[in-house]
Amino acid sequence: RPVIYAGGGIRLSGALDEFIKVVEKLGIPVVTGWNAHDVIWNTHKLYVGRPGTVGNRSGNFAVQNADLLLILGNRLNIRQVGYNWKSFAQKAYKIWVDIDPTELKKPTVQPNMSVIADLAIFLPILLKVPFVKSGEKHQRWLAWCKNRLERYPVVLPEYWLSEKINPYCFIESLFNKLKKDEVVVAANGTACVVGFQAAHLKFGQRLWTNSGCASMGYDLPAAIGASIASNKGSVICLAGDGSIMMNLQELATIAHHG
């Protein structure tokens, strides 16, 4: 019952293409962590969820029932593993691949096998390794994970019955309308948590959050940076009423530079 737990190190290493090739070669269910929302799209046949304390149920079901967890460029912070980290993926043999040896020595989750490596080097090597193709048991496991993804949706039908706008319904509607190459930058709080849970990401979309230090005020400056980096391309900024006030002066930057 293997699961790949993808982290932000995949994009940081520049090895996104190799990552997709590896998971499709192995045929292993994939879950994504903070800052790795968009390393795989929702309709991919191997995507099964986003685990963690603010993740979705299908992702947590996959991790907690896995017997092998391949952790790629993911530092497994508290939001990923929970405050009772001793119960995290208890049944799984954990192979943790990270470029930073300090992350592998934290007093929380302990790997069964530590691999200190740059994913830009590790993933191409893994691609060359021969392997036995998955059998019937593995296919049943993948089907079980996909079933949980369909059986436990984040946005429930009753959410749409509210007279006021439900943030989960809003995020689902927004991402359904976005094009496949759109960029979204989210503030801290509801903007990023609901986005992490409910965003239905398409191939090529980017979703940026400040999950590391989680400070308010990140959204507007980051959206400006994302737009400049894409030659003043279109960027959707999701800002809370408190967060946007932290850097409200950046509206002048937008007005000045157009």
Residue ranges of each PLM-predicted region?
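Glycine-rich, acidic loop regions that bind phosphate or pyrophosphate groups
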Residues: 36-144
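Active-site diphosphate/adenylate-binding microenvironment
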Residues: 146-221, 226-227
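Glycine-rich phosphate/diphosphate-binding loops that line cofactor/substrate pockets in enzymes
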Residues: 1-2, 22, 63-65, 173-180, ...
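Glycine-rich phosphate/diphosphate-binding loop of Rossmann-like nucleotide-binding domains
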Residues: 12-17, 21-24
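Thiamine diphosphate
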Residues: 58-60, 65-77, 192-258
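Conserved catalytic cysteine-centered active-site region
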Residues: 31-45, 200, 232
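Active-site glycine- and acidic-residue-rich loops that bind
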Residues: 8-15, 76-78, 164-167, 243-246
